[in-house]
Amino acid sequence: MAEKIYTIPINEAFDKTLESETPDCPLCLLRRMLEKNEIERITGAAMMEPDVRIETNKKGFCRRHFDMMTGGGGSRLPIALMLESHIAETEKEIFSGGTLFDGKGAKEEEKLARLEASCYVCSRVDDAFSKMLGTVIYLWENEEQFREKYEAQRCFCLPDYKLLLAAGRDNLPKKMFGEFFSVSRDIMKKYIHELGGDVSWFCKKFDYRYDSEPWYNAKDSVPRAINFLSGGVNSEENK
């Protein structure tokens, strides 16, 4: 089957994890790619597009994506321009009108809760990532070569494993989902067992009785375990 433009990043991520010395969740690689692309987009020319500014003014950004925007070493002017209009929008929406006794602050609390839960980058990434999950399931169902690539994966993080199962259950025929679940679960069972052993060995290495023993795969087991439990890219830990 000829490769489509929307399958290219998925195949590249699943290839990269097989080539990497460090086990990684391919879906975490895809999410990180989407985040970086979106950050580059909104701190570039898209920042001045009216429809983009309307959304960034309204939604703002979460702390993680603020940190990604300011941590790239580029000019902070695009960020400042977005902040200028976002702060003005926030002031107008939350602090204009009403009195101190208007619901005893309940309305402001509701608005603040909505703002806190919103992020322009998160909403864009989540939408694109949801489509990518659907494509992963489509490739599993229709392409034998991708199915082999999937079965060769070393791990998925727990949050993405949950999403994979939900997407598979919603989109695959019942019999095929059973196979998908079995393969995915085998990958996870093998990795969590190995990871648990690596973390245990890391702990043992702080016992003087194990001083002369090699580290094996335990040196990076703590960040790997955190990324497995919460999501993250292992191969970027030391960059």
What annotation goes with each model-predicted range?
Residues 1-239:
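Intrinsically disordered, low-complexity regulatory regions of eukaryotic proteins
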